[in-house]
A protein has these predicted regions:
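Short tryptophan-centered beta-strand motifs in secreted/extracellular beta-sheet-rich domains
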Residues: 32, 73-75, 141-149, 153-155
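Short, aromatic/His-centered strand-loop micro-motif at the edge of beta-sheets
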Residues: 121-143
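Sec-dependent signal peptide recognition
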Residues: 2-10
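Bacterial N-terminal signal peptides
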Residues: 9-17
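Secretory/extracellular carbohydrate-interaction modules
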Residues: 56-121
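Extracellular carbohydrate-recognition regions
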Residues: 23-44
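Sec/Tat signal peptide C-region and signal peptidase I cleavage site
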Residues: 18-22
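Short, solvent-exposed beta-strand-to-loop segments that form ligand-recognition rims
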Residues: 156-161
């Protein structure tokens, strides 16, 4: 897990648009057009907004409402063009920095989609690892959609339904 944590924290990705839909059809969106938005940053790295793109390195920012239970969210993200490999990670149901669910696209030698739950004192568990079926390329945009309903989690890539 330490390797995954470091990869997550070292991940540099640009998020173009984040949209969340909660149980009563409330729609919350963020197109990152407000460069003065105050970000709730977790970690010692940097998070910034410029040119309608959210960028993070060595940290991440929290969005939405932690009290939502049934919701979906989507992100459009990419790794920088000069990155060695693609690593795009997003977390949800964040209780704190250590207790949360994480979904990610990891390229390089392993072109996989990961779904895992991180927990305090090493109670981490992989919930699913699936081959992507393609090789992610740095600089290309990828879309992830996550649906959370009760104890069910569904993950879609690009335009899957």
């Amino acid at each position: 897990m330490n390797r995954i944590s470091k990869a997550f924290l070292a991940c540099t990705c640009g998020l173009f648009c984040l949209g969340i839909q909660a149980q009563n059809h409330t729609i919350w969106t963020n197109d990152f057009s407000n460069t003065g938005e105050t970000l709730k940053v977790v970690g010692r790295g940097t998070c910034s907004i410029a040119d309608n793109v959210f960028r993070s390195k060595g940290s991440y920012a929290l969005f939405g409402n932690p009290e939502w239970t049934n919701y979906s969210f989507s992100v459009k993200a990419r790794a920088p063009e000069d990155a060695e490999q693609v690593q795009i990670w997003a977390s949800f149901r964040n209780y704190n920095r250590f207790d949360r669910y994480v979904v990610g696209i990891k390229g390089g030698l392993q072109d996989d989609l990961y779904l895992m739950r991180t927990g305090y004192m090493g109670t981490d568990e992989f919930m699913g690892v699936r081959p992507l079926g393609f090789h992610p390329v740095p600089g290309e945009w990828y879309r992830m959609k996550v649906e959370v309903c009760g104890n069910r989690i569904r993950v879609f890539l690009n335009d899957e339904k």
